[in-house]
């Protein structure tokens, strides 16, 4: 208990903050999940993925639908507002509804706390202090506070499952249970398919084959039957009802643009920024552009829209092949050297590649990179320096999700305090045996650059521009954050291939 008391105290303190935030701003995701409670409670299972009573149709895999169903019956039996369970009560909100839904996020986040506890206890004695700091760092994530406890989602629960499966993937733990939990996680939210290749290669290499590549047929049978059983448990009813095509059409809507309406800070944000600058600048130098393309067209995130004014348009297939090629490169190292740390690096990089180069990526997906990378961040100072621009850029890029004035103090103070904590970790990260030029001062200068950027976005832009160029502050933040995230990606990629063991 003693070594974990700091983690528990941090969890208790943060829970008070989260309860205090119950009345705060709620995004449309709050109504999305209320509607899913209503659908799974009031409609037969055959209608779950067919219902279009609300525009917020069920588009998560079956395990998440089952979870919403269980939550709905808990709400029903414990006397919460039953009107929230009526699918025809569109945009319904009541104090009881808010308390139940906000409270369910906090309770389910205990899975994350348990996973972090297991991570600390499974670490070597000499690494436990840093593991504890990492656990606190993850649980106090500004991203989880913003996205889950204000904006409204269940990422703490989902990433708790991911981190628990990562911890169990240590050879001395329970790799079969790790595979089972990760398979279940995919059946909760299919975005985790991005990192599935790393699990496949690692489990194949370590669990299904001996170090000299002799197949272990019993392990292959156990692994295969476990994974298949979990997917049958999730998708079995829809297989029986012959509704798999309908279910998949909800899970994978391909008619969206390359970028979300608010550009995620990835490679395509940089690409879009260059396109917009070229559109504005080239005509001044006598270059004729296609006047049929509006400056508002590039990557606004609208359905079916992904055209550019100057640069070539990007088809979905190209993003797939870029991600596939880069992930294969990462997986080759994992196949050759299948250690647990290399596995964590591969999970991080597979998620990172999908975030940087994937199609229609949401800014919230940056959690798939930051949280796994946190496990590696205190190996030594090189990893910490690679982590810092990612974490700072990623979390600051989430702040525009909260655009109401009442939430401004908490989002800036909490995120600022977390960044200040991160900047003190130099004392904890070991100095590497192989000294390299870490560009520490460059990283600090880059992070400091967010200060004038936010001053401009929050105060100067409105005074100078008025109602013109409303997209400019978001574009500047997304583009500047993308540089830091891309630089961190290159840094970890270098360490992954040259150092990680």
Swiss-Prot record:
Major subcellular location class: endoplasmic reticulum
Biochemical pathway: Protein modification; protein glycosylation
Catalyzed reactions per annotation: an alpha-D-Glc-(1->3)-alpha-D-Man-(1->2)-alpha-D-Man-(1->2)-alpha-D-Man-(1->3)-[alpha-D-Man-(1->2)-alpha-D-Man-(1->3)-[alpha-D-Man-(1->2)-alpha-D-Man-(1->6)]-alpha-D-Man-(1->6)]-beta-D-Man-(1->4)-beta-D-GlcNAc-(1->4)-alpha-D-GlcNAc-diphospho-di-trans,poly-cis-dolichol + a di-trans,poly-cis-dolichyl beta-D-glucosyl phosphate = an alpha-D-Glc-(1->3)-alpha-D-Glc-(1->3)-alpha-D-Man-(1->2)-alpha-D-Man-(1->2)-alpha-D-Man-(1->3)-[alpha-D-Man-(1->2)-alpha-D-Man-(1->3)-[alpha-D-Man-(1->2)-alpha-D-Man-(1->6)]-alpha-D-Man-(1->6)]-beta-D-Man-(1->4)-beta-D-GlcNAc-(1->4)-alpha-D-GlcNAc-diphospho-di-trans,poly-cis-dolichol + a di-trans,poly-cis-dolichyl phosphate + H(+)
UniProt key word Transmembrane: yes
Ranges facing Cytoplasmic side: 25-59, 117-131, 178-180, 337-341, 411-412, 465-473
Any Pfam family the entry gives: Alg6_Alg8
Keyword Nucleus belongs to the record: no
Compartments in which it is found: Endoplasmic reticulum membrane
Entry's Gene Ontology molecular function annotations: dolichyl pyrophosphate Glc1Man9GlcNAc2 alpha-1,3-glucosyltransferase activity
EC number: 2.4.1.265
Lipid bilayer topology: Multi-pass membrane protein
UniProt GO BP: dolichol-linked oligosaccharide biosynthetic process; protein N-linked glycosylation
Enzyme class of the recorded protein, top EC level: transferase
UniProt KW keywords: Endoplasmic reticulum, Glycosyltransferase, Membrane, Transferase, Transmembrane, Transmembrane helix
Record-linked InterPro entries: Glyco_trans_ALG6/ALG8
UniProt family annotation: Belongs to the ALG6/ALG8 glucosyltransferase family.
Protein role: Dolichyl pyrophosphate Glc1Man9GlcNAc2 alpha-1,3-glucosyltransferase that operates in the biosynthetic pathway of dolichol-linked oligosaccharides, the glycan precursors employed in protein asparagine (N)-glycosylation. The assembly of dolichol-linked oligosaccharides begins on the cytosolic side of the endoplasmic reticulum membrane and finishes in its lumen. The sequential addition of sugars to dolichol pyrophosphate produces dolichol-linked oligosaccharides containing fourteen sugars, including two GlcNAcs, nine mannoses and three glucoses.
Protein name (database record): Dolichyl pyrophosphate Glc1Man9GlcNAc2 alpha-1,3-glucosyltransferase
Protein species of origin: Schizosaccharomyces pombe (strain 972 / ATCC 24843)
GN (gene name): alg8
